[in-house]
Amino acid sequence: MSESDTTDAGDGTALRTPIVAVLGHVDHGKTSLLDEVRGSAVTAGEAGAITQHIGATAVPLDTISELAGQLVSPEDFDLPGLLFIDTPGHHSFSTLRSRGGALADIAILVVDVNDGFQPQSYEALDILKRTQTPFIVAANKIDTVPGWNPNPDEPVQRTLEAQSDRAESRLNEQLYEIIGELSDEGFSADMYWRVQNFRENIGVVPVSAETGEGVPDLLTVLMGLSQRYLKEEMSIDVGGPGVGTVLEVKEERGFGTTLDIVLYDGTIRADDTIVVGGKNETIVTDVRALLQPQPLAEIRTEKQFEQVEAVGAAAGIKIAAPDLDDAMAGAPVRVVRDRPVEEVIAEVEAELADIQVVTEEEGIVVKADTLGSLEAIAAALEEAEIPIVRAEVGDVAPRDIAVASTAEEPKHEAVLAFNVDVLDDAEREAEEKDVKLFADDVIYQLVEEYDDYVTEIEEAQQEQILDKIERPCRFRVLKDHVFRQSNPAVVGVEVLSGTLKRNSRVVKWDGNEPERVGELKSLQDAGDDIDEARTGEQVAASIDGPTVGRQIEEGDELWAEVPEKHAKILEQELADEIPTDELEALRMYLDKQRKRDPFWGK
């Protein structure tokens, strides 16, 4: 185990390196910032001063002190340094999950000062909120402020002193916009040097990944926060059985399927038996090899990895072992060591049960790249009241399409795919079975796209229903506008409320009783045939059945008849979809019917 991974706490336990996740919107500079930290660390120390892990970079305290200059004195810290999770493929922070929340102990949310908060910034905030992970904001790209005078690798205050009033004023405007956006999301925030209590306020650190300005401050704040608020949580049992989380399941030439994991407690050895969360059942297997990247100084050697005998937390490590094909990214990994294997299986299964997504009898199919992502999507769908019938880690396969195609409601014949591929066979089957596929790498956009689709379907369904349903209309026979008395009666009418349509049955109220007087055969306006007439319009109506002067009179108020079943649907399901004048006609029609039968249309 490398010296930099832990520091002795003096009682058999040790303080491990805090795990730092870097997250933010695409192109806001997450990878550049990590590269800058890594590059500066290599320059500041000797070759090998930083340790390159699998999927992570360890920066020891001495190197941080060297980088931060007067800002950090090693004597003030017990923690051994910082371990930056470095997984560009895992741009969803929700990947990094462990017992009870996030795998990362602390996070950096990178926000471009020019763009402010963007979709993935908000998504990251939601996940930070849900997992209660402490974080700071790196306001990146300060070197792009108009008129900026770069001072490579300098702390913020020193570089600000070298700026014109105009450049500093412009930067302040951008920074306060970011602080305002955080406030809108329920976070109290300020420039980090003004924050007294980091538990209650978010510190904003202006940085440039391009020039290194502000990076000393970033490392200082991370070390300070970790030392002050996370020290107790960093206490681990050095020799105890290792506990970690799978970052990625990967094919590796010469080793077969391997696991990239982050170990956050205990130690893993090259001869350990491990238990890993699997897609179908829990996997028990023996470690064949523990692999770390070659040191930076030897990166040109032919071998990409070197084998090690043991690794202690916190570390990123690759495990080669048999039977790992079904392992899941985001799943727990535990070393068995001298405990009964059943006990460890039970622990892993209990942890997986915490992540299980609630599914319903009817709903949509969800596929995601990791367990953490699956959990985050399920939370977003639950909030949007969208039911899930099946939720799994992995690419979209034909069997997922088969499940989606059996949904009772058309809106549930859908698969939501987060950050995974759709297999060719599945795509073909989706077309054949008319299953809608949604793929995105921003959770809220995925949910929004599906929501829009459901709205489209529901609107189309309502239009179909409205087309088939008889709707109420109140109209009056105009005086002195009888063009023909019978067979059929042709009279001038005025529509009082609702829409008058051809082929409607016509009724007239006699006291409390409706009396059917005939059927509306045709409508004309200025000699032209029309299909309907709206409120306020006067048209000629041909009514088959009545004789003017007997069943109907000039000045009579007549109604388009509405069957009881249709009236019920209109009142209970479609009241929001029909125009105000039609709603008025419906209410009057229901009042008349309910005078003789209070339960009519209910």
Swiss-Prot record:
Name of the protein described by the UniProt record: Probable translation initiation factor IF-2
Domain tr-type G residue range list: 15-230
Region (G4): 140-143
Organism of this sequence: Natronomonas pharaonis (strain ATCC 35678 / DSM 2160 / CIP 103997 / JCM 8858 / NBRC 14720 / NCIMB 2260 / Gabara)
Superkingdom of origin: Archaea
Entry annotated with the keyword GTP-binding: yes
UniProt record similarity statement: Belongs to the TRAFAC class translation factor GTPase superfamily. Classic translation factor GTPase family. IF-2 subfamily.
Region (G2): 49-53
NCBIfam families: aIF-2, PRK04004.1, small_GTP
Binding, GTP: 24-31, 86-90, 140-143
Region (G1): 24-31
Gene3D superfamilies hit by this protein: P-loop containing nucleotide triphosphate hydrolases, Translation factors, Translation initiation factor IF- 2, domain 3
Pfam families referenced in this protein's UniProt entry, alphabetically: GTP_EFTU, GTP_EFTU_D2, GTP_EFTU_D4, IF-2
Function text: Function in general translation initiation by promoting the binding of the formylmethionine-tRNA to ribosomes. Seems to function along with eIF-2.
Record-linked HAMAP family: IF_2_A
Keyword Protein biosynthesis: yes
GO molecular function: GTP binding; GTPase activity; translation initiation factor activity
InterPro entries: EFTu-like_2 (IPR004161), EFTU-type (IPR029459), P-loop_NTPase (IPR027417), Small_GTP-bd (IPR005225), T_Tr_GTP-bd_dom (IPR000795), TF_aIF-2_arc (IPR004544), TIF_IF2 (IPR015760), TIF_IF2_dom3 (IPR023115)
GO annotation, cellular component aspect: cytoplasm
Region G5, residue ranges: 208-210
Ranges for region G3: 86-89
